[in-house]
């Protein structure tokens, strides 16, 4: 499960990498 966005959003509800969004599983994924 490689995460190309390099972030999770369990503690912070935002993703800082461009083109990434928070998934239901609290992982930043490409949108």
Swiss-Prot record:
Q: Which InterPro entries match?
A: Cyclotide, Cyclotide_sf
Decide whether keyword Disulfide bond is in the record.
yes
Q: Which UniProt keywords apply?
A: Disulfide bond, Knottin, Plant defense
Q: List the disulfide bonds.
A: 5-20, 9-22, 15-28
Single biological process term from Gene Ontology: defense response
The UniProt function text for this chain reads: Probably participates in a plant defense mechanism.
Q: What is known of its domains?
A: The presence of a 'disulfide through disulfide knot' structurally defines this protein as a knottin.
Q: Provide the protein name.
A: Cyclotide psybry A
What is the originating organism of this protein? Psychotria brachyceras
